[in-house]
Amino acid sequence: MADLATFIRGLPKAELHLHIEGSLEPEQMFAFSRRNKVAIPFGSVEEIRGAYAFSNLQDFLDIYYQGANVLQTEEDFRDLALAYFERLHADGGRHAEIFFDPETHTDRGLPFSIAIEGLLAGMKEAEARYGVTSKLIMCFLRHLDEASSLKTLKAAEPWLDRIAGVGLDSSEKGHPPSKFARVFQAARERGLKICAHAGEEGPPAYVHEALDILR
């Protein structure tokens, strides 16, 4: 069994669905909260780890957004990305397509540039250090309104040559894909590829909308 595990670890791999903010390890969350003097509702790494025993999407999103609050600087986003790429490299990863949620950060007052410049720096360093290539996919938060997603797409314009596509994530109930038809059309017009989460919590109609309206 150990030989099989070693063999599998050594195989070249591509990770095509990774939410970078969701890769924040408990140790990193605790360290970043101290570094940036950001309060979190946990007293130890062990408490954070225990909070990851979620039973539904919303429970996961609650701790996901709590963790995102500790990300304050370009250095934080760079370190977050590098830590992920180090783990990916150790598992034989050669390529990754990374989702990031700029509205998670701009909605709490960070400039758009902080997150994307930090992530791009981490991606560049990971390629130089580990030979791991990567692409960036910008997600819109479906619990926010269409105006917020259109504003985010506008803010992303200086970096469109570094963004491979757009996605749609966060709380699904009550937020059908059709809510974002205009922003996805605008993204396509800018040459961005399209993807979207659908059907995790919502009805089958949401899957149809993602395929028929957002495509």
Where are these regions (language model features)?
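Active-site glycine-centered loops adjacent to acidic/histidine catalytic or metal-binding residues
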Residues: 197
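Metal-cofactor-binding active-site regions of metalloenzymes
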Residues: 1-192, 201-215
